[in-house]
Amino acid sequence: MSLNRVRAEQPAFEVAASAVLIGQAHLGAGALLAQGVVLRSRGGSAALGNHSAVLENGVLVGWPDRPVEIGQRTVFGHRATIVGARVGDLCEIGNGAILMPGSRLGDGCILGEGTLVPPGAIIPDDTVLVGRPPHVLRSATEADRARLAALRGGQVDLTRHPGTTVVAPPVAGAHMGRLYAYRDKSPRIAASAVLFDSAEVTGDVVIGEGSIIGAGVKIIGDSHGPVRIGARVQILENTVLHLLPDNELVVEDDVVIGPGAMIHGCHLGAGTVVEPAAIVCDSSRVGAGSVIRAGACVKQRARFDDRAVLDGFPAVQVGSLDAAPGRPAWAFDPEDLPTPLPLAP
């Protein structure tokens, strides 16, 4: 049985075969979840407006305190990450943009590729925003509006279609995730770990007890070396783990890696939180109980002590924590998950 089945009475929307919907969400008429998109909604906390689209490999995550609410005829580019954010009508969100919890974009906003909107930021209508950290480039012009209208085939009217509520609860199956051997190495997955259907794990990979490997995650442990993932780790939607030759990738217990991240052959200390769309490069080491901020890039061979707060591109230490960061609100609650059946041999 699959984790991405959709039950709906009137399919006035399009969900690609490789897209994954988890939980309850409201999809407007003509809404699109393209290939590889993951939408995770706890408690019915996600809504995509009429004729809005999330393009390939995007991720949306909403929960009751921070719902995802998208207006009409808004388009998100490839690999956009939207976590607990609200976006108005007729917005254009560039490829790789990151919207963090509590942020809010007005109508007609334009975000450049890779723009990061930080937690709680309020962006007025018709703002053109770029960068990490973001800055206002200008207000949208009539030329901008004409271009956006052309991209939408001239259709910029807002409609009254009620849309459809769809429900796709996690369903445990005997073949959760896709496991691939590489030469004489095969993944070893603890019996209590949960792999969502579209996750793929290859080669010399060990995943510990109680860990969660989210939809669309790719973990590659082929000829380049071992991948060791501890207990109670969460690796969330559309994240990629891989490494260079003669290296290893170690994720210690209780680490949480947010959606859309890229983790190379590094060492992440126990209890560390990697926020959405961050990058951690080969041969770097991050101490226990640290936080890597959204969109940050930990460069090759960087070293950071325990409980460091890292941000920037490249990342530098911008603070220290007095205590371990704990599980972020955008992570999975264990009670949200199905009881997994044993993995097939």
What are these regions (language model features)?
Residues 1, 19-23, 176-183, 199-205, ...:
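Short N-terminal helix-initiation segments at or just after the protein's N-terminus
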Residues 1-10, 42, 48, 56-70, ...:
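Glycine-rich hexapeptide-repeat left-handed beta-helix
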Residues 11, 17, 23, 29, ...:
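The right-handed parallel beta-helix/beta-solenoid scaffold, focusing on the short coil/turn
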Residues 240:
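Active-site beta-loop-alpha junctions enriched in small/polar residues
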